[in-house]
């Protein structure tokens, strides 16, 4: 359902402060739901996180792998209705749904793509706004009359609402501008949040997008698809990649333009990969998340593919890559 309120692009400069309060329409993200008597045991055997220990008021990162340990999706998991919900990149959701359902015929589970509307409330005033909406900003997952609120990070909340109640919820948040998903993407980039869009499916193991660093991998749970590869990456040190944020100047182009980088190798340049998610500022700069070798020298240079004069820089990670 299309909102009756106008949706705007939240125009920001690279040195500009983020809005104190804004709402993003998250139409580039999707939600897979799982219900049924066997939902917990079925999902536990499919994903990297510990579903059994997830409390009703908690949210966790997780990954779903193929048999070789390559990711179909990276998601945030939380209790929703009578089951679970997995928030992830919408472009990957059709393939992820097919793979997640592969063994469902042997279990009492229903797995579907939700048609709920996803809204992102963000900014330093987000928690205060959520407290008024739900009367409960203490729990990371809280239900209210129009839907479910999920705490993503200190300044971000996800709202899952029925389509016919979207405008009612937006009216309750009327002091916040309604923006497109780009602002939420920028928060994901600044927080270096794992993301697997369709073009990156079956390309990376969980540690290559830092799932271990955001507590998205349990090394104490039982078996799950791809576990052998994930365990080897931890205990034998076979993982050679990690997720990084890079920033730099970019020639004027549409916000949807794909950003690809090259990295210096001696006197030559080599393809470094495509941004999993990116954001274009209004002052000729951009930033994005890239999977890169985790042993690059500090002096390694980066440049935009096709714009060789535009050098980019790695930004500090907001967390440690250790999983201890």
Curated annotation (Swiss-Prot):
Keyword Cytoplasm: yes
Protein family membership: Belongs to the tRNA-modifying YgfZ family.
GO molecular function, one term: folic acid binding
GO biological process, one term: iron-sulfur cluster assembly
Function field: Folate-binding protein involved in regulating the level of ATP-DnaA and in the modification of some tRNAs. It is probably a key factor in regulatory networks that act via tRNA modification, such as initiation of chromosomal replication.
Subcellular location: Cytoplasm
Name of this chain's protein: tRNA-modifying protein YgfZ
Binding residues annotated for folate, in chain numbering: 184
Top-rank lineage group of the source organism: Bacteria
Main location group: cytoplasm
Coiled coil regions in record: none
Keyword terms: Cytoplasm, Folate-binding, tRNA processing
Any one GO CC term of the record: cytoplasm
